Amino acid sequence: MRCAPTAGAALVLCAATAGLLSAQGRPAQPEPPRFASWDEMNLLAHGLLQLGHGLREHVERTRGQLGALERRMAACGNACQGPKGTDPKDRVPEGQAPETLQSLQTQLKAQNSKIQQLFQKVAQQQRYLSKQNLRIQNLQSQIDLLTPTHLDNGVDKTSRGKRLPKMAQLIGLTPNATRLHRPPRDCQELFQEGERHSGLFQIQPLGSPPFLVNCEMTSDGGWTVIQRRLNGSVDFNQSWEAYKDGFGDPQGEFWLGLEKMHSITGDRGSQLAVQLQDWDGNAKLLQFPIHLGGEDTAYSLQLTEPTANELGATNVSPNGLSLPFSTWDQDHDLRGDLNCAKSLSGGWWFGTCSHSNLNGQYFHSIPRQRQQRKKGIFWKTWKGRYYPLQATTLLIQPMEATAAS
């Protein structure tokens, strides 16, 4: 039995993916994102295709040999028993027949075992191909998002457009393959599919077009990052439309966008994680259940006690007490005599202006003037009303994931 094509294909795949497999065995290290080149992805896809062809040929050859063994066993059985009226002298000697049958049965069991192993390998490779297809889609989306505008014209764009069909052909994808593999609904669904590395991924909530998000994979599952403040590189004093659509750098400071957040949470209850950090390196993690309304509710954050009291929510909603979102040009806060977003800075779920504001002005050091400090990033119940925080991150996850963990 020849297995050279399969072994050769496996060597090609091993050579192409050795770095990837070794990285999966170690905890992910924080390092600048590196996107695989098209040549590397072509080599990986070619190795996968060659391995798949080799396994398929090996299975077909094994099936043929199995059929031959079955025919030999049938012939042996007929020869051992002999038809009625056959001269006993023409039959296989009694001492030899059991040995022949036992030998054939041993070979048959061995072949069956090999076939089962091959089927498992083929199924494993199919799952791996599907996962690689998703990775390639994510890489394409990342390149489209992060490539400078001047590289997105002319030769570079045309060359990239020509390479995509070639990649799909190498890994055996049809033009409609992406429809068969819908992007995950959120980072938790991506986690359930086996992804364990944090980073940028494409998701597609129900009823929404696909878009890129930052996923943080933890032992508790996949969390979708919806906000990050860390260095003041992005101005968060934005309009209602900007907060609705999202802004910033997905690899740095950013706001995902209220409409995207609402599409992720949908009608499901979600868990909101709030990560806070002060200027002395101290950190605080808060988690509480939320519902997020649509634009018709001013994207109200619907809370239950005691969190509602902590954030100053007093409006009654079907899911508890609610806080509508406000910006300088869309005032929905609970202060009738003041626009909190104008008085402070940034858009936020303001109560009476004094409970929290994680989208406030970023200070690289704590200002001396109290009037200036109140415009900063603060969470009153942790560091007080006039302490501007150094860094914050907001993450969401569906409630069913929290209940299952």
Curated annotation (Swiss-Prot):
Q: Where is the Fibrinogen C-terminal domain?
A: 178-400
InterPro entries from the entry?
FIB_ANG-like, Fibrinogen-like_C, Fibrinogen_a/b/g_C_1, Fibrinogen_a/b/g_C_dom, Fibrinogen_CS
Primary localization: secreted
Q: Which residues are glycosylated?
A: 176, 231, 237
GO CC terms, sorted = collagen-containing extracellular matrix; extracellular region; extracellular space
Q: How does it assemble?
A: Homooligomer; disulfide-linked via Cys residues in the N-terminal part of the protein. The homooligomer undergoes proteolytic processing to release its carboxyl fibrinogen-like domain, which circulates as a monomer. The homooligomer unprocessed form is able to interact with the extracellular matrix.
Q: Would you tell me the protein name for this molecule? A: Angiopoietin-related protein 4
UniProt lists the gene as Angptl4
